[in-house]
Every structure is written in structure tokens, then in C-alpha cells.
């Protein structure tokens, strides 16, 4: 279901006029979409974010492949910060890497870092673009491919034709609940 269709489904439930055609560009930059429709669009994104966090949806899974470099410990995942790592597999050897704490990685490096096939990974901040970085232990001594299986939330919906990746019904109903709370039609109950 597209972003415009999602907005229209909420508007129908609110007995409001729907958006008859796609807008061009981002919704907030469009002069053809009313302010109220933009509010409903924002509530769709709020609801989408909540639904995405409730489950590890298959449609949100991605694989980030990292090629190691001999003697290099730190790697950039180039995937943003709001991800969940489900599994890490060394595609070269078939071994699964285990997540460890930064404290553990700091402990095992004295007097020098161990070298060999990576068995562990730990988070080590982010780069200037807010992409997560990981340290490997032992430090690789050869080129290997590590596959990080991640859950990554879909970017906020802004374009009319963007298709939602998670189930639409809970997103629609969540946005509708937020909309009736915003209008004061919820009978005084709290909505989240």
C-alpha cells in the first residue's frame, strides 16, 4: 500500500476528503496537499515507527557485507544507527560471530590485539554520517567477507508512491487512533 493510499484510508475513517492524486516531491514541500493531510501523513509515520519496533519484520531485513582488510580492526556498517543486528556470519568460513562488549574488546587487546579469524564483534561508536562502526576480535589477517544480517526501519514516508514495507492495517489503525486523539474525539482516553 502506498503512502497516499495509507493517508486516504485514515481520512476515510475520519470522514474527511481524501487526496485524489499523487503529489510531486516530499509531502511537506507540496502545495497541493492540505495542512490537515500533512498531519495525517505525520501520524502515519509515527504509527509506522511503532509497528516497526514491535517485531523483526522480514521485509525490514537486509544484509550488509563487509570485506575485511588484513590488520584492520574497525569497520563501518554504512547502515545508519537505528538497526538491530540479527546475526553475523563469516561467509568465507561459515562461522557465526558473537557480539561482545567494548569492555571485553579492550580487555583482550593487551599487550597487543590477537590476530586471526574474527570470532567476536563489538560496537565502537559511529562515523560522521551516523553509521555504526564495529571492532572485530581477533583482528583479521586476511581478506574475508562478513555478512551482518540486520533489521533496518524504513525511512519516513514522504513520497506519494512509496510502498509501506510492514503490514498496513496496524499502521492505519494506529494513525487513526492518533488522529482521533488529536481531534479530541477519543472520549478522554490516552493514546500512544
Stretch-by-stretch model annotation:
Residues 1-192:
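Glycine-enriched, solvent-exposed interface loops adjoining structured elements
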